[in-house]
UniProtKB/Swiss-Prot annotation:
Its cofactor is FMN. It comes from the Bacteria. GO terms for molecular function: 3-hydroxypropionate dehydrogenase (NADP+) activity. Induction: Up-regulated by the nitrogen regulatory protein C (NtrC also called GlnG) and repressed by RutR. Keywords: Flavoprotein, FMN, NAD, NADP, Oxidoreductase. This is Probable malonic semialdehyde reductase RutE. It comes from Escherichia coli O1:K1 / APEC. GO terms for biological process: nitrogen utilization; uracil catabolic process.
Amino acid sequence: MNEAVSPGALSTLFTDARTHNGWRETPVSDETLREIYALMKWGPTSANCSPARIVFIRTAEGKERLRPALSSGNLQKTLTAPVTAIVAWDSEFYERLPQLFPHGDARSWFTSSPQLAEETAFRNSSMQAAYLIFACRALGLDTGPMSGFDRQYVDDAFFAGSTLKSNLLINIGYGDSSKLFARLPRLSFEEACGLL
């Protein structure tokens, strides 16, 4: 049986973690990005399908390619973040299932139903984006996930001619706590949950 993580770890991952909009000028190394992926890849996905594909934008040139896709409210925070991750999903993720889920012909589940394939890819890549956020937090980084961007522009600018489609953006770095807003409330258990 697994042991519960420490209260300090819970604070780092959940209760004290914040969505950051301002960033310290501390770089995030490529090795750290590899460590993030090395952790997040172990998060569960249905039939181990692992549809997320990530582009880590960490250069000024990459940010300029991304700039036209950003909403006005997300522009400055993204241009100043050390890294912006484009979390995309592979519409043909099922081609990797013989490698990832060799227990049966899982590939055929999705080749026979394009709607199921798209729903599965989008849902599971969204879960993987959450794993990325928690991997960042576990390694001492802060994040700022965003859905306010022109997905079609990103797909055309970064994924043209491929099977990838963008899902969301996540800024990554070491947050400037002086630029945080007051913490917003969350729903109580009674407001959000039911017991049957």
